[in-house]
A protein has these predicted regions:
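TRNA-recognition modules of translation machinery and tRNA-sensing kinases, especially anticodon-binding
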Residues: 1-154
């Protein structure tokens, strides 16, 4: 009997007949973000585990129960990204993007990974759009992000 390999529980295949829908959504989101002055950023699929422990919180369910982590040579430990803000902020700081002036506006459309109980609408690998406005404490910044979200949904 042949061994049948199936996709992991909580993941989905985006087959050729469905990819066009993804491209359409990604285009709408990207164009809206760029109209508002956001620039796309792409961060690694995995980061040092400590980044998420510090930013998300050591006692949160995400860190305690839901992260996919692996140990590497030495004392290194890496985690598949469970959310986007931590890696995005690390990249903004590490690459000196804030030195280009404030506020800095970045967006991402990425895959994320959490070991959760699967159910309709909740997968272990999921896709998310996010935007970060760095260096502005103004309520106008929040209003701008809300306006961006509304324009995507319209």
């Amino acid at each position: 009997m042949a061994l049948i390999v199936k996709k992991p529980k909580g993941t989905e295949d985006i087959v050729p007949s469905k990819v066009y829908k993804w491209h359409t959504v990604e285009k709408i989101v990207s164009e809206a973000a760029e109209i508002y002055g956001f620039k796309e950023i792409r961060v690694p699929t995995f980061e040092e585990t400590g980044l998420f422990v510090r930013s998300v919180g050591e006692t949160t369910d995400v860190v305690q129960k839901e992260m996919y982590s692996v140990s590497a040579a030495g004392d290194s430990k890496f985690t598949l990204r469970p959310e986007g803000t931590s890696g995005t902020m690390r990249a903004v700081l590490e690459n000196g993007i804030m030195n280009e002036g404030l506020p800095q506006k970045v967006y991402y459309i990425l895959s994320f990974f959490r070991h959760e109980n699967t159910q309709k609408g909740r997968l272990r690998e999921f896709h998310q759009f996010g935007c970060e406005m760095v260096g502005s404490e103004s309520p106008r910044a929040d209003a701008e992000v809300i306006s961006l979200a509304k324009s995507v949904l319209d």
